[in-house]
């Protein structure tokens, strides 16, 4: 395995474990009454207005120069992390193999 696949595995494994776990709380009695359609409609309306507000805020504050800077920082940072992950992997494998 190369360093990139090890890093990807290291980052995705906890996420997959978290998503695969089922959260169990105290057992509550289930209600037999169906949820009110008016309540669902109200929640849907609130959700749509929140999405529209967030999209509007994003569109108003978007700066191409900042976006390019963030992309550049991300690419340089991920390259550095890949390098140091490879070094760390080599060190761990050397320690596990021992002197031959």
Curated annotation (Swiss-Prot):
UniProt xrefs under InterPro entries: Apo-CII, ApoC-II_dom_sf
Keyword Metal-binding: no
Keyword annotations of the record: Chylomicron, Glycoprotein, HDL, LDL, Lipid degradation, Lipid metabolism, Lipid transport, Secreted, Sialic acid, Signal, Transport, VLDL
PTM annotation, UniProt: Proapolipoprotein C-II is synthesized as a sialic acid containing glycoprotein which is subsequently desialylated prior to its proteolytic processing. Proapolipoprotein C-II, the major form found in plasma undergoes proteolytic cleavage of its N-terminal hexapeptide to generate apolipoprotein C-II, which occurs as the minor form in plasma.
Subcellular location: Secreted
Chain spans, region Lipoprotein lipase cofactor: 77-100
Region (Lipid binding): 65-73
Family: Belongs to the apolipoprotein C2 family.
This protein's name: Apolipoprotein C-II
Gene source species: Cavia porcellus
Lineage start: Eukaryota, Metazoa, Chordata, Craniata, Vertebrata
